[in-house]
């Protein structure tokens, strides 16, 4: 029934995702990746296209399925002034390492004003 058709397939897929991350962490301490496949939408615009809104977090889904710690930080703006995010992904129980790396990155990158703030204030 549904257990075999969906749940077991989902568990197998989850295991494959975790194995892929394990293989990467055998070589690397941390993975840096975009936080989303596109820049942030303008306020209210994502409600007009629910599929686009759903797909905007696709880059974080595998990390969550694998049960890995990650943190996303502002990385800059696109040519239209919309924010772009950077994701720091760590192996299991490496939260301290990714938080330290994200903090160091933010110190080097400098202040990133919120949308309601003016640049330099």
Question: Which residues make up each language-model segment?
Answer:
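Short, surface-exposed loop/helix-turn segments at secondary-structure junctions
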Residues: 5-9, 39-57
